[in-house]
């Protein structure tokens, strides 16, 4: 009995102590070995102390930042989270994260690689604990490269000796059109973006158009176009393929690349060489993964700080380095016997010490699109580096311009109330006119069945549309909204930022969108109708098999189809150019001019869209009695006349809704534009929906401006559908 009481007391005490442990929620986006190491750290921490209990939540990387900015201000976010440092400026400005106290900063500095500390500094304050870092280094195949190049001249000499472009072999491979992978050359030529420490402009803006940047872009273009040692239009997948197949001896890439290298490939890594022309090292961007503590009232700051101290300790760093295969920020760990012989991690450490921390300024994110556009112009020879960078600078200044002036919402609220009263009056009038109340009392059953659909429409269509339209009257930056009235609409419709002939203007994009929709729908209907007429004929054998095969393009997810066609249009390795070359024709740079890029998009979307029209037309054709065509045949009508005067008029009632639906789909076909041409060249093949996306997510998160774009898209489609409907009724 005494033993039973003793164990009950122990149980109650342990329950009480566990209940007293406060929870620390940590968000992360780790996968694989990194996640396993973090889970082990959590387990160790929870076992070694009884004051806090850490809980980890894995959030997909693509959704991470948006979830944070939405959840933390509302008190629904984590106590701490692990993320790359480049968003620190945004989060510090919006009050999402808490700055570190001076004692913690001094302690971290003792045993951290200096550049990883610098990356976490914003406005002279430190905002996080450095955990690990990523930068690009030089990967090389040890079976092809016997000596590590110490300079770019040596690297080019090795690359030239191993290049055979006619057979698809290149001495060096990297994504030359990417700003991230081109940054080592920009810094190697002493270039800058003016967000770097010690190189900032007084006005805090970027400086893309400096001579050193131009020299770097010229050098990259020479590697790709003149020397031909780097593949054109290189993508991440292509770089991996070339390296694994032994068709590229050297690659500039980051630690994520190791997971893509085949197991039987002999390789090693080295620090990027010195630029022979300048004597400067190739300095890549440094990205630091930091442990950041959220800042709102309910955050368990003490618990979050306690876990931060543990995972940044020597023990925590060793687990992350050895088991998680992370390049950790803790200096002393590289002297440990477990890592002292690890060449790969030590090379990444050496590269980190000379790399340039990517700026965490909110305006840094604005430079990617203008700089990428300048790079692509130079690579395809459309403009000189100097002119391309001048255009990039102007584009940056437009994207980062101040928000419109705030306006009083009083007048707009009055207008909204008047409109609401008019709408309510119209609604009441319609209810009385159609005796809705009486009908509801007499026959409630039909309305009972209609209610779920009506409720879903209100919840999923009308409310989001109303919210989206309302956002169009606001301007957003760094988590803050301010009412600006019709300013966004005025800026778009008056083309205040860009000339009408500029690819980034609303009217140019509208013209491209209308042409894109018209050409696609014409091809969808023409090809679909032609195939339907063939499949209808009884003399065609295996019609069922053909129908099934022709529906496949429509059944495959469109993003998969888009990526396949994107690869087929590659200049050097694509199947389309392979066919052209087999016929003795020159290969085409499909995305270097408007018409070829537009044709590539249209081809891809036609492949996706014709099956829908074929199925619709085939169903309508099978409902047309053959006797009508036989009678026309007896009257002497030929095939074309029978189709024109008998078949097509009977098809129109079925085709018209399909054409309207297909037009709306094509008008908003974001995936094809985004994945195939990416809007190239210079945004010329963008359509309205892809432009709205860029304003929302790539140009300082201008949600109000993007919402105004979306509202205008809705108005255009509404006018189109109503016009088409009236024309169809008039003709019928």
Where on the chain are the PLM-derived regions?
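A structural signal for short loop-to-beta-strand junctions that line the ligand-binding cleft
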Residues: 79, 107-143, 170-171, 278-284, ...
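C-terminal lobe and pocket-closing loops
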Residues: 257-266, 275-370
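Hinge/lid segment of periplasmic solute-binding proteins
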Residues: 84-137, 147-158, 185, 268-272
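A structural signal for multi-pass alpha-helical bundles of membrane permease subunits
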Residues: 445-732
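Conserved C-terminal helix/tail region of periplasmic/extracytoplasmic solute-binding proteins
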Residues: 353-423
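Extracytoplasmic/periplasmic substrate-binding proteins
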Residues: 29, 181, 218-303
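Extracytoplasmic/periplasmic solute-binding protein
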Residues: 125-131, 136, 156-205, 248
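Glycine-centered hinge/linker elements that transmit conformational signals in sensory
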Residues: 158-159, 201-232
């Amino acid at each position: 009995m005494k033993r039973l009481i003793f164990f009950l007391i122990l149980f109650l005490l342990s329950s009480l102590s566990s209940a007293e442990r406060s929870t620390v929620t940590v968000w992360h986006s780790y996968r694989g070995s990194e996640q396993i190491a973090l889970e082990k750290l959590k387990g160790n921490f929870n076992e070694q102390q009884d004051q806090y209990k850490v809980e980890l939540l894995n959030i997909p990387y693509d959704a991470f930042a948006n979830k944070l900015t939405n959840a933390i201000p509302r008190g629904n976010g984590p106590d701490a989270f692990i993320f790359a440092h480049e968003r620190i400026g945004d989060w510090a400005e919006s009050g999402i994260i808490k700055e570190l106290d001076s004692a913690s900063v001094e302690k971290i500095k003792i045993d951290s690689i200096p550049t990883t500390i610098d990356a976490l500094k914003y406005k002279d304050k430190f905002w996080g604990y450095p955990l690990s870092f990523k930068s690009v280094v030089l990967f090389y195949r040890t079976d092809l490269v016997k000596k590590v190049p110490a300079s770019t001249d040596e690297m080019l000499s090795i690359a030239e000796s191993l290049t055979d472009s006619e057979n698809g072999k290149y001495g060096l491979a990297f994504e030359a059109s990417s700003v991230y992978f081109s940054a080592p050359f920009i810094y190697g030529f002493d270039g800058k973006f003016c967000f770097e420490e010690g190189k900032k402009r007084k006005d805090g803006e970027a400086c893309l158009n400096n001579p050193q940047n131009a020299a770097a872009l010229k050098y990259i273009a020479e590697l790709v176009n003149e020397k031909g040692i780097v593949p054109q239009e290189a993508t991440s997948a292509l770089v991996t393929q070339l390296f694994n197949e032994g068709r590229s001896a050297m690659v500039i890439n980051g630690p994520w690349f190791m997971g893509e290298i085949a197991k039987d490939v002999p390789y090693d890594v080295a620090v990027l060489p010195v630029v022979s022309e300048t004597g400067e090292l190739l300095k890549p961007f440094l990205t630091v993964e930091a442990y950041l503590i959220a800042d709102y009232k309910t955050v368990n700051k003490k618990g979050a700080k306690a876990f931060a101290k543990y995972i940044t300790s020597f023990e925590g760093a060793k687990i992350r380095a050895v088991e998680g295969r992370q390049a950790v920020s803790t200096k002393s760990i590289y002297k440990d016997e477990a890592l002292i012989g690890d060449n790969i991690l030590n090379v990444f450490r050496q590269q980190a010490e000379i790399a340039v921390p990517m700026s965490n300024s909110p305006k840094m994110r604005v430079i990617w699109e203008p700089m990428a556009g300048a790079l692509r112009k130079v690579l395809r020879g459309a403009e000189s580096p100097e002119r391309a960078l001048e255009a990039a600078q102007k584009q940056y200044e437009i994207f980062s311009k101040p928000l419109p002036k705030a306006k009083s919402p009083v007048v707009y609220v009055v207008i909204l109330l008047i409109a609401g009263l008019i709408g309510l009056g119209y609604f009441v009038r319609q209810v009385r006119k159609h005796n809705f109340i009486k009908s509801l009392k007499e026959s409630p059953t039909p309305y009972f069945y209609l209610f779920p659909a009506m409720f879903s429409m209100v919840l999923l269509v009308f409310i989001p549309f109303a919210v989206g339209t309302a956002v169009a009257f606001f301007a957003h930056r760094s988590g803050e909204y301010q009412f600006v009235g019709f300013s966004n609409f005025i800026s778009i419709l008056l083309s205040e930022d860009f000339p009408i002939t500029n690819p980034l203007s609303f009217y140019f994009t509208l013209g491209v969108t209308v042409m894109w929709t018209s050409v696609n729908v014409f091809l969808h209907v023409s090809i679909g109708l032609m195939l339907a007429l063939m499949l209808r004929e009884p003399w065609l054998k295996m019609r069922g098999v053909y129908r099934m095969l022709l529906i496949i393009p429509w059944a495959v997810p469109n993003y998969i189809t888009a990526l396949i066609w994107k690869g087929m249009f590659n200049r050097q390795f694509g199947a389309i150019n392979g066919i052209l070359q087999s016929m003795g024709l020159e290969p085409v740079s499909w995305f270097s001019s408007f018409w070829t890029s537009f044709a590539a998009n249209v081809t891809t979307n036609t492949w996706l869209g014709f099956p829908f029209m074929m199925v619709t037309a085939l169903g309508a054709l099978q409902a047309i009695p053959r006797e009508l065509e036989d009678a026309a045949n007896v009257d002497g009508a030929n095939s074309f006349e029978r189709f024109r005067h008998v078949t097509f008029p009977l098809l129109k009632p079925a085709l018209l809704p399909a054409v309207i639906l297909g037009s709306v789909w094509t008008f908003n076909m974001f995936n094809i534009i985004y994945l195939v041409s990416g809007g190239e060249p210079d945004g010329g093949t963008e359509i309205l929906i892809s432009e709205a996306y860029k304003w929302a997510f790539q140009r300082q998160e201008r949600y109000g401006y993007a919402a105004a774009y979306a509202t205008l898209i809705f108005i255009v489609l509404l006018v189109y559908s109503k016009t088409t409907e009236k024309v169809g009724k008039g003709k019928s």
